[in-house]
A protein has these predicted regions:
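Short acidic, glycine/serine/threonine-rich loops at helix termini
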Residues: 2-6, 110-118, 156, 195-200
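Generic non-transmembrane alpha-helical segments
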Residues: 47, 51-55, 87-96, 153, ...
Length: 245
């Protein structure tokens, strides 16, 4: 089998997602491997989203455990996004029994960066007045869309921070990074005008299963695949008319 995800103590031993279980156990002999429980994950996710709705109706879900919230029009806590985030995290901890990290910032790009800053149980705030200073020192690998290939290209150009990217013109960014250059021009300055998409339509539907033991033959895999296909059909049937097979 493979590791779907792991907690932060396990990561300190070098364990990470998509790693073979055997390799993970060699790195961390005391590792406890538990089977996934997606029904439970979906139930907990629904509980958390119910708490979100106490503070705003402008919610853009990203996954079972992540979402953007626009609280700019909220009258709670004197319209303090920081205090709303504090209250929300406390509600989730007390009612659901898990920790939540939150990032407070003027836009989605910076909010995502901020939410990752103090994981697994923290709150990080980027006030509007501090955006310029914060972004200038931000490593380029924190920019959404900068993966291994783009990161290597930036390293070859000695571009280490968003401040370094700011030294390049729109034209130069386009020459080096193609159509992504225009988006880089704005993101490296902390600019992101994307609105919250409350009616966001899912672009895919999937099913998955992690196995305790490797399947040895093609026949074994085909037998398992039949079961997954049936589950996928069931999931399609539960979706609305937006999903067509």
């Amino acid at each position: 089998g493979v590791i779907a995800t792991c907690n932060y103590p396990a990561r300190q031993f070098g364990v990470h997602s998509a790693m073979a279980s055997s390799q993970a156990l060699r790195r961390c002999p005391e590792l406890v491997i538990v089977p996934p429980n997606f029904d439970k994950y979906r139930k907990v996710s629904a509980q958390i989203h119910d708490i979100f709705r106490r503070y705003t109706s402008l919610i853009e879900p990203l996954s079972l455990d992540e979402a953007f919230l626009d609280v700019s029009a909220s009258e709670q806590f004197n319209n303090s996004a920081t205090r709303i985030a504090q209250a929300l995290r406390q509600d989730v901890r007390q009612e659901v029994g898990i920790t939540v990290s939150a990032g407070v910032a003027p836009n989605k790009f910076l909010a995502k960066v901020a939410s990752d800053w103090r994981k697994p149980d923290g709150l990080f705030v980027i006030p509007p007045a501090q955006v310029e200073e914060f972004v200038a020192a931000l490593p380029v690998n924190k920019i959404s869309g900068v993966g291994r290939v783009t990161g290597e290209r930036m390293a070859g150009l000695n571009l280490k921070t968003c401040g370094d990217l700011q030294q390049l013109s729109r034209l130069e960014l386009g020459q080096h990074f193609g159509s992504f250059g225009e988006r880089l021009y704005h993101l490296c300055r902390g600019e992101d005008s994307r609105p919250i998409q409350t009616g966001r339509r899912r672009k895919s539907v999937s099913v998955e299963r992690t196995y305790d033991k490797d399947q040895l033959t093609l026949t074994d895999w085909l037998r398992e695949l039949e079961g997954l296909i049936e589950k996928l059909k069931e999931r399609f049937a539960k979706q609305d008319q937006h999903y067509l097979s």
